[in-house]
Amino acid sequence: MTDKSFPASAITRVPLALLLSGLAGCADAIGFLEFSQLFMSFMSGNTTRFGAAVAQGEWDGATRVASVIAVFCLGAFAGTLVAAWAGRWRLPVLLWLQASLLCLGLGMPEGPVPFPFHVYPVVLALGMQNATLQDADGRSLALTYVTGAVVRFGTGLANLLLHKPADSFWIQAPLWGALSSGAVVGGVLHHYFGEAAFLFTAALAAGLALAVTVLTLAKPGSRLIAGTAPAPDAPADAAPVTVVRERATAPS
């Protein structure tokens, strides 16, 4: 079976996945504490809140949560298009966009209760984050939520007994740990800095963006920062949108 991982090399893909998952957990905890228990990346929780608000006739609250879910979906939509368009610059472009959006929220007006404008840039950034990396099957790695990681870990354990798990099984538990650790860090940062704690997540995204920009310039087409894969979650017969430089030696 064709390996559709992005980046192709686990040397960079796994650390990036863990750091980005930690970033998402951190941002989610900051937003949850700062914005009246509104999730920045955990759309399952927001969906439950939406249902409860509708059931109780709290239309401002229902609109508030629904708008956040829509913006997160827009982020995933835009991130996938950027991933397809940017080619070998996919990682730098997506990470710089995320860093910029995480900063932008701090300068946005609060907006009315149903439409929290200052939340949208953060949610948009985290939606885009899910288009950044792909597993061996071409699926976007679940970087901003744990339900998928927990389910894939559980089914992977079963498949470990039945036959063998998918290649992406081994990263699921570390992803959960990274997201949980990031949430702890986010809670501590919010305690001391309030909403300004988002600057920490922006700085982490910018640091990762700078690192992959340097790698892209120094090693164009390297498996460290590229891959031969369709856009995230594309059908099996979709054409590749990124190109890896072929090497006669061991993959870099």
List where the protein language model places each region:
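Hydrophobic/small/kink-forming positions within alpha-helical transmembrane segments
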Residues: I69, C73-F77, W176-V184
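Substrate-agnostic recognition of the 12-TM MFS/MFS-like secondary transporter fold
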Residues: G51-A52, G57, A125-A183
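Helix-to-loop junctions at the C-terminal end of transmembrane segments
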Residues: G75-R88, H190-H191
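Short, Lys/Arg-rich, polar N-terminal cytosolic tail immediately upstream
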Residues: M1-R13, R223
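A membrane-interface helix-boundary motif in multi-pass transporters
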Residues: W89-L94, G187-A203
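Symmetry-related core transmembrane helices of the 12-TM Major Facilitator Superfamily/SLC fold
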Residues: W96-L101, A196-V212
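C-terminal ends and interior cores of transmembrane alpha-helices
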Residues: A99-P114, T213-T216
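Hydrophobic core of transmembrane alpha-helices in multi-pass small-molecule transporters
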Residues: L18-D28, Q37-F39, L101, V113-T144
